[in-house]
Amino acid sequence: MIPSSLFYCANKDTYPPFKNGLYKEEYFLKTFLENNPITKRKYIPALWTNFQIEGWFQSYKENMQSILDDWVLNNPCENGYYVVVQYDDNCLLKLPENTIIYGSCSGSIPIPLIYQDKHNTLENISKINFDDKTILCSFVGNITSNKVLPNVRDLMFNTLASKKNFKLINSGGWNPVVNKNNQDLFINNTLNSKFALAPRGYGRSSFRFFEIFKLGTIPIYIWNDIDWLPFKDEINYNKLCINIHCSQLDDLENILLNIDKETYNNMLNYYTTIKHLFSVEGLYEKIINLES
């Protein structure tokens, strides 16, 4: 462990609202310490997102960098290091040059943007079958973005919001507390949709991509600069979901209308064969296997 509690502070937020348990950085650290696996590269044990969202981080950043540098000097590894990061902007401390970053939104290797839900809130909701879904495609969320152009969510709303087969609801600006009304809007509209939009936001990924599957609906991942879907060595995304660059939004309606019931259900069935990779347990196992 890095000899400073600053690297292990609790996360002050509960976001998304369906989280009940640990964030993936927390789960990975906890499970790593319990199992002490042998890996080629050395794991840098830190809860990056937890301390980087704190208001005090900038004041302590220089001190934390010094502590991290000392830890690296005292824990040499010829093969290099690796970190596991959720934070959109990656690690805000300087890492050794030979570090692999398993990142949810940026880094070296894409990983799922997920969290632990011990209650299985979304999975336990009764699903609606293909024939009874009344909406072709929906979205409930805000128009969050960063400075990477084009702005995916703006473009998505401008292109699709007026089409009768699409139901897009702007829930307002991003807030770490999602009220019950917006939770219900997301759940009910997603359940009743054959497809649901999962555009990148500030980061390259989206929690909703993984949540949509849990509601028995197929997500549409929309990206601009880099496609950040994880584990393509093991997952065939052509069999799993719709994956488009934002320049293809004009074609999306025709793409969806040409997917029949059999193809749709095959996607959901394929999801059941790979969904363990979208869990904190499966993510831990995958990274340890890659590092072994």
Residue ranges and their predicted role:
Residues 1-210, 215, 222-245, 259-266, ...:
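Nucleotide-sugar donor-binding catalytic core of glycosyltransferases
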